[in-house]
Amino acid sequence: MKKIVLYGGQFNPIHTAHMIVASEVFHELQPDEFYFLPSFMSPLKKHNNFIDVQHRLTMIQMIIDELGFGDICDDEIKRGGQSYTYDTIKAFKEQHKDSELYFVIGTDQYNQLEKWYQIEYLKEMVTFVVVNRDKNSQNVENAMIAIQIPRVDISSTMIRQRVSEGKSIQVLVPKSVENYIKGEGLYEH
């Protein structure tokens, strides 16, 4: 049975902390396949500074190239509108019947899982991998996996704000992503 990891997020933009999460999960679980799953629009997040989806996909591919593993699953992008993880996983599972699916979330998402659409069915379809960036270890439900990673206080919101203020984002994102953001004039308004 294939082991497949799905790492969802807006990735607007993808950054160094996302790379650390991907790397830690990849090396801990050693999956056969690893997918970055960019959302079109998350139902639980505000949508400020939204850029053309192609920019996000390009930056994710740059991260994949740098990490040396992973692919992009753009199912939610193709669907458009609000993305519910349940719908995405259900469709993905139909395409990958003989696979064990692992879905990466942070402790912030873990703490609001009860708000997720069809969460009980979703728990039957995937094993949640809860990534904790805090000093204290996270207690998770028995059917879930907790992975502790180094705390890195970087957020996409911070990066967008720094760019709009003309501040440096060096090392917050890989050089290729930094150059792309500058070259395309992203987040400057």
UniProtKB/Swiss-Prot annotation:
Pathway: Cofactor biosynthesis; NAD(+) biosynthesis; deamido-NAD(+) from nicotinate D-ribonucleotide: step 1/1. It holds the Pfam family CTP_transf_like. One of its GO terms (biological process) is NAD biosynthetic process. InterPro entries: Cyt_trans-like, NadD/NMNAT, Rossmann-like_a/b/a_fold. It comes from the Bacteria. Signal peptide: none annotated. PANTHER family: NICOTINATE-NUCLEOTIDE ADENYLYLTRANSFERASE-RELATED, PHOSPHOPANTETHEINE ADENYLYLTRANSFERASE. HAMAP family: NaMN_adenylyltr. This is Probable nicotinate-nucleotide adenylyltransferase. The gene is nadD.
